[in-house]
């Protein structure tokens, strides 16, 4: 009876020894999915924001051509801020892919 119990404990230990690797593989897969979705949504939102900013600048310049230079400067500042958000999403995605603190 003791031999059977020892054998069952040994087999259970061997069977459960690989769970850490499976958990790491799953976490890597979820990290890739999250990075792709997060960066895709950030790029989509940034593109929509840039489009609205450019459209508003063009409409403002068409209404008052004298303010074209000021509107253009303001538009470039706004575009830089919008693009910074997408770059932040890229940095977070790269951290999730290559320097994931949960993988150990």
UniProtKB/Swiss-Prot annotation:
Topology versus the membrane: Multi-pass membrane protein
Record localization: Cell inner membrane
Molecular function per GO: lipid binding; proton-transporting ATP synthase activity, rotational mechanism
Keywords, comma-separated and alphabetical: ATP synthesis, Cell inner membrane, Cell membrane, CF(0), Hydrogen ion transport, Ion transport, Lipid-binding, Membrane, Transmembrane, Transmembrane helix, Transport
Any one of the GO CC terms: plasma membrane
SUPFAM superfamilies the UniProt entry points to: F1F0 ATP synthase subunit C (SSF81333)
TM regions (residue ranges): 31-51, 75-95
Quaternary structure and interacting proteins, as annotated: F-type ATPases have 2 components, F(1) - the catalytic core - and F(0) - the membrane proton channel. F(1) has five subunits: alpha(3), beta(3), gamma(1), delta(1), epsilon(1). F(0) has three main subunits: a(1), b(2) and c(10-14). The alpha and beta chains form an alternating ring which encloses part of the gamma chain. F(1) is attached to F(0) by a central stalk formed by the gamma and epsilon chains, while a peripheral stalk is formed by the delta and b chains.
Family recorded in the similarity comment: Belongs to the ATPase C chain family.
Function: F(1)F(0) ATP synthase produces ATP from ADP in the presence of a proton or sodium gradient. F-type ATPases consist of two structural domains, F(1) containing the extramembraneous catalytic core and F(0) containing the membrane proton channel, linked together by a central stalk and a peripheral stalk. During catalysis, ATP synthesis in the catalytic domain of F(1) is coupled via a rotary mechanism of the central stalk subunits to proton translocation.
Name of the protein in its database record: ATP synthase subunit c
Organism per entry: Sulfurimonas denitrificans (strain ATCC 33889 / DSM 1251)
Gene transcribed to yield this protein: atpE
